[in-house]
Amino acid sequence: FANPTPLQIDFPEGLPVSARRDEIMAAMDQHQVIIVCGETGSGKTTQLPKIALMLGRGKLNAKPGERARMIGHTQPRRIAASSVAKRIAEELKTPLGEVVGFKVRFQDRLSKNASVKLMTDGILLAETQTDPLLQAYDTIIIDEAHERSLNIDFLLGYLRQLLEGPRRHDLKVIVTSATIDAERFAKHFALDDVPA
């Protein structure tokens, strides 16, 4: 996979997700939903948005005349949303908010042209009220899905319904878990004729 972005994207060696980057990219390229399981510290949270950028997702990769959309990346807690955004921006050597930013209650560090938006799952849930098809996004990463909060459970159900409909076949969904719940999450997203 060639890097379509103007960014220099590096993947720290030693992280399991970096080591399996090609496999993850192939899965993202071929499937609408992928489930990534890996323990804490495997690089899921920081490397998956960079992999999505490498696949041509996010506003900075929009072609002329194409609707520019973001990579949405949910975190269960506000502090995680802001610290993960800072970390990814640092790894991409870009100012916080320019390419990667965050939005949490009472705080928004996101430029109009940002490609990756870190947020709490509650923020994304609230956005379903004003943007029911989640048109602002070309990719949604639901991180730490094993935490099974009401917000996460509702979002997973909402996304499944959205993907079943005819209007968002372009949307990619990545669900991450620190536990081996892959089969349960895959069954949740499997359609009658299409396994997840």
Identify the residue ranges that each predicted region occupies:
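Conserved P-loop NTPase motor core
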Residues: F1-A196
